[in-house]
Structures are given as structure tokens and as C-alpha cells.
Amino acid sequence: RDGSAFAMLTEAAIELAEALVEAIPCAEQVLFAATGAEATHFALRLARAATGREKILKFEGAYHGHHDYGILSVTSRGTADLPRPAPESAGIPSRVLDEVLVAPFNDLAAVERIVKQHGGDLAAIIVEPLQRIVEPAPGFLSGLRDITRRHGILLIFDEVVTGFRLALGGAQETYGVIPDLAAYGKVVGGGY
């Protein structure tokens, strides 16, 4: 009861999950992970499973963890209006580059162009609602919500950094936009 658990949830984990569902606007269920990278990776995998689609859209400069999809295009590559996926580490399979599309942060017109071209293949758009120190432009997050709803694409908020820091309900509460999925880490686990 008070030791390590490898398969079964403890009462404390269930209580924490219930508190998270109460605090996080989009939360209906909780999957615990050991790291924020695992949380974002699980969210992407769930989006692919739910939609039956392969591709994801992320934003240039966003870091979603050290998994193959999270560490693409953390720095600028390609043109300003159409960045291209670029690995930030050796060992990322070229197939991953075919499954990830990249848009400039705060550019809804670019997102619309990409969705128009690839919408039927897009499982999810993953976004850090507050990209470290770059705030979302007015209407950007709600615009993403509208685009994803119109095209059957899941919207994922990477709240590993923003969760419980901007407000108890994270960026979802602060900006009034509710995604389909959210990934939390750092503060939720007692980290920095």
C-alpha cells in the first residue's frame, strides 16, 4: 500500500487523477506518465489512434520533448511563411519528417493553408499555448480551435510548462480555449 506500484493504481494516484480532472478544463480522464515528453508522445499517439490519421502539425520553435516528433523544428528552418520539419538530433528516421508539418507560431493563415492541403491526413495540431515567452496573438488559440473542429483534427495543448503556472486550469483557463487533449508535466510532478 505504501510502496512502489508498477501495474495497479494506488488510492493516492486515483485521488490525484480526480483532482486533475476537477482542475483541468478539458480533462475527462488521466493517463500518468513519468515525463512531459512521454505525456506529449502519448497525446500524439492517442490522436492518431482516435482519428486514424498519421500526420501532425506543430509550430516552429516549439519543443515537445525528446521523442522523435517533439524535437523537430525547435530552431528555424525553411522559409518564414512555410517552415519545414528539421531534426534537432541525429537518429530521427526520415519517415518522421514526412509525418510532421510545421507552421509559424501565431500565423493562422499558414495553418489554414496547411490544413487545406493536408487536412484529411492530419490527426492533431499540437501547440504550446504560451511558447515560452511568446504569447499567443489575440484570436490565435481560438482560431486553432475553430480550424480543428471544422476539419475533425484534434487540438492538443502542451501544458508541460504552462500547466498550473498561468492559472489552476493552466492556459486553457487563462485563454478560454479548451483543447481535445492536454499534456502536463513539471509542476504537476513536483518538478521545475
Each PLM stretch: what is its role?
Residues L20, A43, I56, V100, ...:
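Buried hydrophobic positions in well-ordered alpha/beta secondary-structure cores of metabolic enzymes
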Residues E173-Y192:
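Active-site PLP attachment segment
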Residues F42-R45, H67-L72, P136-A137, R165-G170:
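Short acidic, glycine/serine/threonine-rich loops at helix termini
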Residues L72-A103:
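N-terminal glycine-rich dinucleotide-binding loop that anchors FAD/FMN and/or NAD(P) in oxidoreductases
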Residues F6-A13, L31-A37, E60-Y63, V161, ...:
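Active-site nucleophile and cofactor-binding loops and adjacent substrate-binding regions
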Residues R1-E54:
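Glycine-rich loop-to-alpha-helix module at the N-terminal edge of alpha/beta enzyme cores
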Residues A49-H64, G70:
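Conserved PLP-anchoring active-site segment centered on the Schiff-base-forming lysine
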Residues D107-I114, V127-L154:
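Active-site core of PLP-dependent enzymes with the aminotransferase class I/II
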